[in-house]
């Protein structure tokens, strides 16, 4: 008498439904890699070129923002690799592919103007993360979807706090 098999191996289960290519999710992840790399550079510039009232508070806060951005960069790069993609990894690739544009540092820019620039960068990232959320949802990629959702929630909170510091509503 032959024993009936009631379970299947993970490979057999995975073979039931072929995984989609997730091309759009990979494209948005790579866009995020480029943009997060440039965002880090912009935050670093704000950190270095900041002068005036509030310096002692905002200078270390930029370190916190950079650390958070670096965490998203690493997570999204590694997710892209996990999906079979190849993340941008050179300054040239970041610069050519990022939608964020860098400007020369200027000590004459006020802290308020610097913070407004950070808000502008964070608004762009929040919109990009929303796009990543939508695309990964359409492709059924729940892990990438979660990554974008968590990142967007945190960035939106930073926008709210920065806008409050600037005496403005968050306008999300």
UniProtKB/Swiss-Prot annotation:
GO terms for cellular component: cytoplasm. Changing residue 59 to A: Decreases the iron incorporation considerably and induces Fe(2+) oxidation-dependent degradation. It catalyses: 2 Fe(2+) + H2O2 + 2 H(+) = 2 Fe(3+) + 2 H2O. Its EC number is 1.16.-.-. It is an enzyme of class 1 (oxidoreductase). Changing residue 104 to P: In strain: 6407, 825, 849, BA 70/12 and KU5. One of its GO terms (molecular function) is ferric iron binding. Belongs to the Dps family. Protects DNA from oxidative damage by sequestering intracellular Fe(2+) ion and storing it in the form of Fe(3+) oxyhydroxide mineral. One hydrogen peroxide oxidizes two Fe(2+) ions, which prevents hydroxyl radical production by the Fenton reaction. It binds and incorporates Fe(2+) iron. Is responsible for hydrogen peroxide resistance. Does not bind DNA. Homododecamer. The 12 subunits form a hollow sphere into which the mineral iron core can probably be deposited. Can store up to 480 Fe(3+). This is DNA protection during starvation protein. It comes from Streptococcus suis. The lineage of its organism: Bacteria, Bacillati, Bacillota, Bacilli, Lactobacillales. The gene is dps.
């Amino acid at each position: 008498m032959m024993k009936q098999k009631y379970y299947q191996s993970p490979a057999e289960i995975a073979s039931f439904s072929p995984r989609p290519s997730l091309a759009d999710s990979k494209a948005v992840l790579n866009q995020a890699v480029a943009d997060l790399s440039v965002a880090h550079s912009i935050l670093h510039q704000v950190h270095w070129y900041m002068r005036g009232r509030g310096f002692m508070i905002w200078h270390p806060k930029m370190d916190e923002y950079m650390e958070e951005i670096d965490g998203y960069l690493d997570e999204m790069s590694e997710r892209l690799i996990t999906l079979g993609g190849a993340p941008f990894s050179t300054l040239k690739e970041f610069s050519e592919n990022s939608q964020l544009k860098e400007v020369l540092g200027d000590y004459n820019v006020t802290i308020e103007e610097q913070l407004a620039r950070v808000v502008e960068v964070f608004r762009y990232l929040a919109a990009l993360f929303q796009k990543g959320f939508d695309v990964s949802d359409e492709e059924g990629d729940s892990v990438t979807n979660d990554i974008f959702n968590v990142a967007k929630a945190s960035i939106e909170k930073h926008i709210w706090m920065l806008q409050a510091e600037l005496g403005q509503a968050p306008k999300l």
